């Protein structure tokens, strides 16, 4: 497929000043990556898409001015996102370069046009390849690489006057700079600045860049060096994970209402299924009351027909470290967790299977996050021990109120995860799978929804 997107203009947004300086121990305007940052260096950038539509959208030039001026104001507070991932000399550490020369380059801001109508843009939900063209490109195969890039795309059937009908804002952020929570904190602040002129609205917590709590761990330096030897043995070149072939993928998005989620939790809970503990081999103490939204929805996804099945997911560690990291920490602070079950526990597809899947997720979180960094020297060993054909990888942004992202012209009609790090991935509840697997997954997934109010 050829490109459906034409670049109209590309510029750089620069912050006039920095209002949130780096920690005192960060010399030379550089933030040394922690072991948790280094772990994500080979990953493709995180990419998010926000679809806005309606007659209330401002003319495209006015919309661009609002986004650019508010981005500049936000970068003054989120300084590392204006910098670059780079190699420091002579230590050969990978750092976020926030020096004046790096930050002064600004964040690349692309204005683009989609070769189709507003209605065409609405129908892109199942087209992974088209989605990839709506977000800016960040190539992570060699350092330095910018931390952030932005693209704003309009359909071709609009002009610069009046309401434009639809627009898509795409954001790409290098995963080595921060995790999903870091990205969403930035996007929330940017939207607040667009609405009110400043990201520092009531309730705003300035981002924290200090990685000392993580870097002080006795195994931190050795593990970080191990990650670097594997992911970047010939700095500044990077062994980036290859992009999955989007032409082989199918994409689906499913909407679960709040009522359906409540009903799902009630179905899973043994207290609402009196015979579950005795009839399905699930002790009453095994499944928490109630399961979290994440565990409940994950149980819908995680059904398999392998001898052993694994669910891989990242879990936030900020509140679980000792001392804890603040919620506003701008960096990576997640751990890859593994839930395990057998074919017999998952394959019946009934309420019992859902309960066992939810229980396994909750138990994995309890065990593996009690001391998040205690087994850090075994993470690679554990990951390599999981058979690649026996796991489902899942991610979630449900805690981040994505549909509250209002830049001043209302909430988005759709928010999508455009980056997929592996060939098959589930983002609650947008699904990317091999095309041959999608129909079977969809039939099973929808059958599990039967009976939800």
Please tell me what each predicted stretch does.
Residues 37-39, 147-154, 423-428:
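Short, surface-exposed beta-strand/loop micro-motifs that present aromatic residues
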Residues 10, 24, 150, 237, ...:
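Generic detector of low-complexity/intrinsically disordered segments
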Residues 1-36:
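Long, contiguous juxta-domain segments that are non-catalytic but functionally important
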Residues 2, 113-116, 121, 125, ...:
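A signal for specific C-terminal beta-sheet/loop modules enriched in small/flexible residues
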Residues 390-453:
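Low-complexity, glycine/alanine/valine/leucine- and proline-rich hydrophobic stretches
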